[in-house]
């Protein structure tokens, strides 16, 4: 399931800010991602180019990877803690019937949703004496359901220009969300692959990632990320799901100003 917010997080996570000129708060870039899908799709591996951005206007910000992922307002309470209220225009796990294998293409398209979200971000450096360690919580709700994610990230500066950032996290999907994207309705049944109705309940996933960033100049950098995500039984048992997990990678080049 392609999640633009998680792709954005992998691309922007733990940028080596110390390697860039002071005051570089905005970012634009291009990249390419490759990965498989848990859906019963025709393509074994999807390779797609994408644009990425992270722009701030005072407390307001705009972020995106492969589309506009977040448009929001961030409030910094302390140097270690901040919150954000945002709009996610393309949330969800969309899939088009034309992309599915024969026998699975009788379903209706699963579309994205416009979701309102709340984010919490805390730097654990002072609290637990964990340098360059961050925990983030994100909750989103739209007409097709609720989902949330909590991620722990630690950044290691290998040199003044190169950093790596391992992370791991858990995601939750409400029953309404899971049923819309992975359930099968009576009207979608056929005589080949989709022979019974499927109404899943709430679901979970776990994900790990490794991200690296290299500052080429004071303003130009590149990033490389790898991620793996595995899903709970409610999603794995869906007739339109092929595998329990998915692997993805992304390479990007960006300009900070």
From Swiss-Prot:
GO CC terms of this entry: cell outer membrane
The keyword Protein transport appears for this protein: no
Keywords for the protein's UniProt record, in alphabetical order: Cell outer membrane, Membrane, Signal
Record's subcellular location: Cell outer membrane
Signal sequence interval, chain numbering: 1-21
Major place of residence: membrane
Family indicated by similarity: Belongs to the MipA/OmpV family.
PANTHER family with a match to the protein in the record: MLTA-INTERACTING PROTEIN-RELATED
Name this polypeptide is given: 24 kDa outer membrane protein
